[in-house]
Amino acid sequence: MGDKMPDSSQLVIGADLAGQPIAQAMRLANRHGLVAGATGTGKTVTLQRLAEAFSDAGVAVFAADIKGDLCGLGAAGNPQGKVAERIAGMPWLNYKPQAYPVTLWDIHGESGHPLRTTLSEMGPLLIGALLELTDSQQSALYAAFKVADREGLLLLDLKDLKALLNHLRDNPQLLGEDAALMTTGSSQALLRRLATLEQQGAEALFGEPALQLEDILQPAADGRGRIHLLDASRLVHEAPKVYATFLLWLLAELFEQLPERGDADKPLLALFFDEAHLLFADTPKALQERLEQVVRLIRSKGVGVYFVTQSPGDLPDDVLAQLGLRVQHGLRAFTAKEQKSLRAVADGFRPNPAFDALSVLTELGIGEALVGTLADKGTPEMVQRVLVAPPQSRIGPLTDTERTMLIAGSPFKGRYDKPVDRESAYEVLMGRKGLAPEAEPGKPAAEEPSFTDKAGEFLGTAAGQALKSAMRQAANQLGRQLVRGLMGSLLGGSKRR
């Protein structure tokens, strides 16, 4: 960038060895990116720095908070010691300690707003990956979804799917030509997998009010992009498949719902996928191929995807080849295999005659990185050794009190916090049997609203969100079948409206 002062049109990463800013044009931020490095080298702080830059430019951010300290974005920084020294060496940074507009989410609803989707919205391909089904079990699941679509049975939560499977076991004639797919063994296996999923606490992910993507894209009152943080500190250890599947669903929904934007001065949304290797671990080939397609195509929808992991080798080559911005923190290499991997990382950068990237990789200190940006024409710049700019927010977690206050002051307070259990497959099928559905603990049935309620107020409530979801479900069924699976638009299905 030379002596030019960086602004919000630039995604500033830090300074080179001469103290000059290293940045990439914000309009190229939809070309995706990578933040990699060994544990303890500074990846989280780099992620924090990038999230701030996006927010300042008015770009929404969704990121997973794996260690629990990324939430420091919600409090102003207090730089001291080496951090203060680094800031002093970057006078062009215009550093100003400040908190950022953060919304906290938690699938379990403990450390943030509950985060939910429905089985119908997730689709059988992703659910099959979540349950780690065999091919025959996956076929049985598709057959069940097909019946649900034909019978008009909404699949919102796990009890809906269990009720449907039990119903098909007792009434196999409903499967028609697909009856051979739903054997006793496959049905029992599906029910066992669902029980295991419940034991992992995954049932909290499915239900209503479901997450509305327009809420993710909604800017803060001051025009900055809102930063949405998913507290995954518990989830990623207890149920890594649930964590990965939710992120895949989010990516698929964005691809399906967002219109084409073409070239723009900045993205709509930046997604940060921490522990990115989990997205590809034991992933069925069909799902991985679709994921690679979506990563390639979603940039035209204004979404930049940033993978955060220890080594670039954690990602498939087809995905790695699509990543424009690369921030590589230090790596350690002791074995011959690690040395080979290290060389591959160095070879992934455009060489800089000023230094040997391979040698530098093992010398980088905390908060240092090799950075490869894109030039204005979209071609790779020479790799630079960079001191990452400190974030303006707090480096470290919020206190419990601060977290509670942040949730209480959230613009989404009351919209997602209380679950709504409206009539769906479980209630319909229990009704056909003449049985009264059992109320789930903590899941009250939705009350019918008064006609005197204002429409705007109603649609902001949990019940209103459920109504919007119901309308969306009905539109989906008119436009496409539930068996579309993941990214149905890639397979010729209709997009959501």
What does each of the following model-derived ranges do?
Residues 4-5, 10, 18, 114-120, ...:
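Conserved P-loop NTPase motor module
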Residues 43:
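Conserved lysine of the Walker
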Residues 20, 28-33, 224-230:
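Pre-Walker A (Motif I) flank of P-loop NTPase domains
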